[in-house]
């Protein structure tokens, strides 16, 4: 399905990502963890082709994504949608119009200029908002929503592209614990119900363990861990974060206090929806 083959990104003398290799042979939810500057965001931006790799290849269904240009590159970016920490919404525009922006890559310039959308796209946008629990806010300006609601609007916009892969770059870093939980549950359900691959950069170990099928650890641009959530021990975490024996997971905790925190959310996301 998706293969990242020795992907490297250099900025001058600095190597941001160093020969990263990943194989994703079926839809799953992957969490990428590591310290700030480990190369997590750069890796996602290269996969989406927002940034070009210096070396290496990205293969999707045996097609070399790194060679795509023009319309083919834009089509890939729709197939591999990206969600950002800062939401990237148009604040003074209503929620449903922000969601409809997910269709811009397949609309004419004239239709874009005059905000002309097919009725079926409008209905689909509202259905997606309803699925994410925010259809009641469709007519509101995006700036009137909470951070968690805005991030769900960003997820809805990504879903309008009908992507095979969703890349989420620190999707909960700016959210309070309760909204962070809501957003992660939404991403988990999208994977489980739609069969989409979700790859999320995460800043907390407990979030990666709770919601992901697979965890990738990056340190200094290299992938130093790739395994199951239960294999992410404190010792492994120390290696990923470059910490000594005093390392405490509490420093990376989202502090979401739930009764079933000990259970992987990949087993219970549906029950908490």
Swiss-Prot record:
Residue stretches making up the ABC transporter domain: 2-245
Listed InterPro entries: AAA+_ATPase (IPR003593), ABC_transporter-like_ATP-bd (IPR003439), ABC_transporter-like_CS (IPR017871), ABC_transpr_PhnC (IPR012693), MetN_ABC_transporter-like (IPR050086), P-loop_NTPase (IPR027417)
GO cellular component, as recorded: plasma membrane
Binding residue positions for ATP: 34-41
Membrane topology according to the record: Peripheral membrane protein
UniProt cross-references to SUPFAM superfamilies, sorted A to Z: P-loop containing nucleoside triphosphate hydrolases
One Pfam family per UniProt: ABC_tran
Keywords for this protein: ATP-binding, Cell inner membrane, Cell membrane, Membrane, Nucleotide-binding, Phosphonate transport, Translocase, Transport
Superkingdom of the source species: Bacteria
PROSITE patterns with a match to the protein in the record: ABC_TRANSPORTER_1, ABC_TRANSPORTER_2, PHNC
Catalytic activity: phosphonate(out) + ATP + H2O = phosphonate(in) + ADP + phosphate + H(+)
SMART domains, per the entry: AAA (SM00382)
One Gene Ontology MF term: ATP binding
Keyword GTP-binding: no
EC number: 7.3.2.2
Localization of this protein: Cell inner membrane
Function: Part of the ABC transporter complex PhnCDE involved in phosphonates import. Responsible for energy coupling to the transport system.
Family from the record: Belongs to the ABC transporter superfamily. Phosphonates importer (TC 3.A.1.9.1) family.
Oligomer status and interactors: The complex is composed of two ATP-binding proteins (PhnC), two transmembrane proteins (PhnE) and a solute-binding protein (PhnD).
NCBIfam families: ABC_phnC
Protein name: Phosphonates import ATP-binding protein PhnC
Gene name of the encoded protein: phnC
